[in-house]
C-alpha cells in the first residue's frame, strides 16, 4: 500500500494504477492527485519522488 501525490501533468499514472494495481482512494487537490493504492514494488521504485 502506498500514498502518492501525482502531478496533473503525469495523470496517466493514475490510469496505470487503476489497470495494474488496486486504487483505494483518489482525491483531486490543488497540488496534484492524491492516490492511496496497492501497487507493485517496481512502480514504487520508479516513482519514489511521488510517495507522500
Q: Locations of the language-model features?
A:
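C-terminal-of-GTPase-core extension/linker across diverse P-loop GTPases
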Residues: 1-52
Amino acid at each position: 500500500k502506498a500514498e502518492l501525490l501525482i502531478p496533473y501533468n503525469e495523470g496517466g499514472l493514475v490510469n496505470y494504477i487503476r489497470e495494474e494495481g488496486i486504487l483505494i482512494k483518489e482525491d483531486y487537490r490543488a497540488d496534484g492527485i492524491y492516490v492511496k493504492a496497492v501497487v507493485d514494488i517496481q512502480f514504487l521504485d520508479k516513482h519514489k519522488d511521488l510517495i507522500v
